[in-house]
Amino acid sequence: MTPAPEPQDPPTIHEPVATEQTDDISDWDVESDYEDGYGAPSKSQAQGGASAADRPKINAHARIDDQMTDLARHASKIRLDNLTMQQIFRDKDRTDNATSDQVLDNHTRMIILNMLNRNIISEIYGTISTGKEANVYNAVAYDNNGERIERAVKVYKTIILGFKDRERYLAGEQRFKTIVDKALSAPRKMIKLWAEKEFRNLKRLHTAGIPCPEPIYLKYNVMVMGFLGDHTNGYAFPRLHDTKITGETLEETEAEWRRLYINLLSMMRRMYQVCGLVHGDLSEYNILYNEGVLYIIDVSQSVEHDHIEATNFLRMDIRNVNDFFARRGVDTLSDRTVYHFITDSTGAVDENGMRKAIDNLYATRPPLAESEEARAEQEIDNQVFRNQFIPTTLEEVYNLEVELGKKVDTRLYQHMLADSKVPESTGGEHKSGEGGESGSEDEEGDEGESGEVESGDEEREEGEGDRFEKKRPRGKKHLDKAEKHAHKMAVKEAKREKRKEKMPKHVKKKLVAANKKRK
């Protein structure tokens, strides 16, 4: 009688260490970013077809440590504030630790090292600016010919959020409505969404030809963009607030400031009409200046023009721009006039057309009195406009009868209304002939006789009757037998042609099985 086989120990399963760092790494999907596993043998081939329950699990924590070890050779290429990466890691001072925690946490550090490994950037060597939501650093890249290219790397803070009012700019954003609720409840997801928002806004501005940093690469909370500054020494362009324009005469200086004011209004209009965006935080601190050109930066909080807060943000931008240029001695337009210029959908969006429109606004406005009382009245009008309720949808117009009695120029929402003349249907005979003549006479004034007005009304009613005559309803059930048969044969023929390009079922099964093995 053969003895019974001795029981064998079950295969060792290496469980990943359940730490907070492991959970964060799995949530951020770091493995998929740095190891694609393309061309590696499948698990079934390596283990001889073992079942899923017997296969050892991957120790993700150990794999990430190995990747950090491989990428550590690039640590010397990151120099922030004249400190090497090793000094930042080893120094235990509270200030250095706070800087490392806010910006260069483990995940952000790994993303930057991976960018260096992929030659997206070659070195980070200095700080351009620091803010409440992100820091911007100097970076260097090299093209295929070995030419040095200056870049800017914007790293959004992830741990200590100095800017906590992001919900106001994200809520109601149609581009992110499917994920904004989850992002608002998780700070790390909100940072990722915030960086993606600015990257997409920069793409819109750059495509529309508005001077701004060129967006190049985005990974989680690290964005690489074009550098706006001197490429020889790495100094960025100055902000508009720090710019000093000095001409040979006082008139030349005032003319240059006025030209910049007109250019900025044109950029705001193009940003609204072409890009469909409102900056939301436009001021002299978010505008760079170099050789007569203005550059728009920091568009992370920009919203679309149909956002629930877009009107308030636009009025705030107009107030900041007018106040700044007024302090520089520019004769600015009123806030109400600038608002109508930006939101008018019928005007031109090219440079020459917008410049002519602004010159026309200056020419047609009422003359300004030099007295203090007149200036005070204009300031009161600006304050009223800044605090006035402007409906964004027609559902918010409550007293319609009162609004219809107002003049067209006093309606703040006039740009949302259609033209007063509704295009009539083609083929109507009332457009030409006696009906058209009587209608035109009725529009000229009160000089026409009552008989002519009545005839015009009769012709108009006849035209409306032709336009609203009864037509056959839609739907297959209202078709006759021949039309139904023709439609049925056309549908069959379309399906027959579609089946010719259909993938065979056995080929589809093989592809599905192959994809499962790769996973």
Curated annotation (Swiss-Prot):
Its cofactor is Mg(2+). Residues 21-36, 439-464 have a biased composition (Acidic residues). Its EC number is 2.7.11.1, 3.6.1.-. ATP binds at residues 154, 228. InterPro entries: Kinase-like_dom_sf, RIO-type_Ser/Thr_kinase, RIO_dom, RIO_kinase, RIO_kinase_CS, Ser/Thr_kinase_Rio1, Tyr_kinase_AS. Pfam families: RIO1 (PF01163). It catalyses: L-seryl-[protein] + ATP = O-phospho-L-seryl-[protein] + ADP + H(+); L-threonyl-[protein] + ATP = O-phospho-L-threonyl-[protein] + ADP + H(+); ATP + H2O = ADP + phosphate + H(+). Residues 470-489, 497-519 have a biased composition (Basic residues). Mg(2+) binds at residues 286, 298. GO terms for biological process: ribosome biogenesis. Changing residue 298 to A: Decreases ATPase activity. Keywords: ATP-binding, Cytoplasm, Hydrolase, Kinase, Magnesium, Metal-binding, Nucleotide-binding, Ribosome biogenesis, Serine/threonine-protein kinase, Transferase. The keyword Metal-binding applies. Residues 1-10 have a biased composition (Pro residues). Belongs to the protein kinase superfamily. RIO-type Ser/Thr kinase family. This is Serine/threonine-protein kinase RIO1.
